[in-house]
UniProtKB/Swiss-Prot annotation:
It comes from Cupriavidus necator (strain ATCC 17699 / DSM 428 / KCTC 22496 / NCIMB 10442 / H16 / Stanier 337) (Ralstonia eutropha). The gene is queA. The lineage of its organism: Bacteria, Pseudomonadati, Pseudomonadota, Betaproteobacteria, Burkholderiales. This is S-adenosylmethionine:tRNA ribosyltransferase-isomerase. It is an enzyme of class 2 (transferase). Monomer. GO terms for biological process: queuosine biosynthetic process; tRNA wobble guanine modification.
């Protein structure tokens, strides 16, 4: 039985990308080509390419599925009426005036108390606790105040304060549905010029929404993976996407998830017969080796943190040994890791 330690790997800190490249599609792409069905290191071959070369690995009638969520400026600094400092990270917008948020303070705020945010620009009222989150009531539409006064919530491994460049580059070019507190980073590599080439090659694309939560950065704290409680995220799958999947299957194309968030939404909405059910809801799907994929044939994804649930997910798709070999190669070849880093193209291993 695999344990948490099986998903550890050595990563030199200097390989953690601290800023995005000026040209989105100029990132590197590690293509993990499968030579044999077995999950062994010699059953795959590593091919080093530029991300813009991904067109060479896609076929007419393949369907790329993107997550169109938009990152909101979810981080606030402020104070209590007593003067004590606080930090707020919005996790989810519940309705027009209500959010769930993490609140860091020297003393836990109580229900009914007031928190002053953004140098006193406005105040929120603390509501009931929901698991580890606080309900916060905003005096005006929450998304308006978040956009006006919040700060972009860069991941904890990026060490600089967010600036105007990050506000552009930590968003996909197709982001349109505000609600995420982390970017669906595989999509950061796509630009309009690459989309034009994909169109010319007959590659189709479709969109879903999954609002990425801060839980994506939470570490797994149990060696026994079955004891891990996965965070929950809201997603929506449209009838148009469900039809696009049916059309793709009818034409013999592949369903390729752009990013682990797209994959998690697709597999959450997938039916036993391999079709996709339109609808929306919360998902806490936890994909580990042994999972049987219902829908996704391939995945475009960035490189993930050691011992993370996302490293377990890609291992389930491509094979534990294949991913170990790929990550060794990536470290040796000095690929850039994590949100602002490079990407890989993985195909589903036989039987997964």
């Amino acid at each position: 039985m695999l344990t948490l330690s099986d998903f550890d790997f050595p990563l030199p800190p200097e390989l953690i990308a601290q800023s995005a490249l000026p040209d989105r599609s100029a990132s590197r792409l590690l293509v993990v080509e499968r030579l044999a069905p077995a999950d062994t290191a010699d059953a795959v071959r590593m091919v080093d390419r530029a991300f813009s070369d991904i067109v060479d690995y896609l076929r007419p009638d393949d369907l790329l599925v993107f997550n169109d969520t938009r990152v909101i400026k979810a981080r606030f600094f402020g104070h209590k009426p007593s003067g004590g400092k606080i930090e707020v990270l919005v996790e989810r917008v519940v309705d027009s005036h209500t959010v769930l948020a993490q609140v860091r303070a020297s003393k836990t705020p109580t229900e009914g108390s007031i928190l002053h945010l953004a140098d006193g620009a406005f105040a929120v009222t603390v509501g009931p606790r929901v698991d580890q989150f606080f309900t916060l009531r905003f005096p005006e539409p929450a998304l308006d105040l978040i956009e006006r006064y919040g700060r972009l919530p860069l991941p904890p491994y990026i060490r600089h304060d967010p600036d105007a460049y990050d506000e552009t580059r930590y968003q996909t070019v197709y982001a349109r549905s505000p609600g995420a507190v982390a970017a669906p980073t595989a999509g950061l590599h796509f630009d309009d010029a690459l989309f034009a080439r994909l169109n010319a090659a007959g590659v189709r694309r479709a969109f879903l929404t999954l609002h990425v939560g801060a839980g994506t950065f939470q570490p797994v704290r149990t060696e026994n993976l079955a004891e891990h409680k996965m965070h929950s995220e809201w997603y929506a799958v449209s009838a148009d996407l469900a039809q696009a999947v049916r059309d793709t299957r009818a034409r013999g194309g592949r369903v390729i998830a752009v990013g682990t968030t797209s994959l998690r939404a697709l597999e959450s909405a997938a039916q036993a017969d391999g079709t996709l059910a339109a609808g929306s809801g919360d998902t806490d799907i936890f994909i580990t080796p042994g999972y049987r994929f219902r829908l996704v044939d391939a995945l475009i994804t960035n490189f993930h943190l050691p011992k993370s649930t996302l490293l377990m997910l890609v291992s389930a798709l491509a094979g534990v040994e294949a991913i170990r070999a790929a990550y060794r190669h990536a470290v040796e070849q000095r690929y850039r890791f994590f949100s602002y880093g490079d990407a890989m193209l993985l195909t589903r291993q036989p039987g997964a």
